[in-house]
Amino acid sequence: RPCIAEMGGKNPCIVTARADLDHAAAGIVRSAYGMGGQKCSALSRLYVHERVADALIVKLKQQMAAVRIGDPTKREHWLGPVVNRHAYEQYARYVDALRGNGADVIAGGRQLREDGLERGWYVEPVLAEAPLEHPLWKQEMFLPILTLHRYRERDTAMRLANDSDMGLTAGVFGSDEDVRWFQRHIEAGVTYANRQFGATTGAWPGYQPFGGWKGSGSSGKAIASFYYLPQYLREQSRTVVE
């Protein structure tokens, strides 16, 4: 019987100099912090062209400041708690590791215990500009923590985006030509372009093929093409003698 193994992701997004920054900010916040970053398809690595980085950071901070954190059973709250005490403590360790190893924590970083949040593991979403040698660029955290790097040449951005053992999902914000370039070179099984409802996410079940590359999985599903179809077939030699 065929086996589909989905092994997680360390998912990147590239924002080019020609991106719609409002769409980019919306998609980045939703993807990095939705469900508390506790999903395999969450965005955790952001590469932004240096020409638009400052403007995008302003928009990201505005959207992050508007996030309402609290009881997820109440509709007015967009961000609920992390899953348990271990995740809550890991969050604090990761934030300390960012600050202690040369990163600039641009927004977030606090564990929240006031204003009715003492009965749960609530944390602020984090945006941090981190040096490329920081180990958290490589580690899947499963938390609302996003690292950012400014790039000058888009080939550098692509090299960095692909510099991972994983390849589940990836996103881009840019022009039509940027999108074509991205899709030719990115090493990920599920890609999105200019999607303000989530820069990275999984495939839409029943409508899109799904499958990770590299360490993110073996095989795919949804029978999207002849690449996957043979995995669900078995050869049988039949001989009839009359």
Where are these regions (language model features)?
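ALDH superfamily catalytic-core signature
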Residues: 1-131, 155, 193, 236-242
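Conserved C-terminal structural/oligomerization subdomain of aldehyde/semialdehyde dehydrogenase
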Residues: 14, 26, 68-72, 80, ...
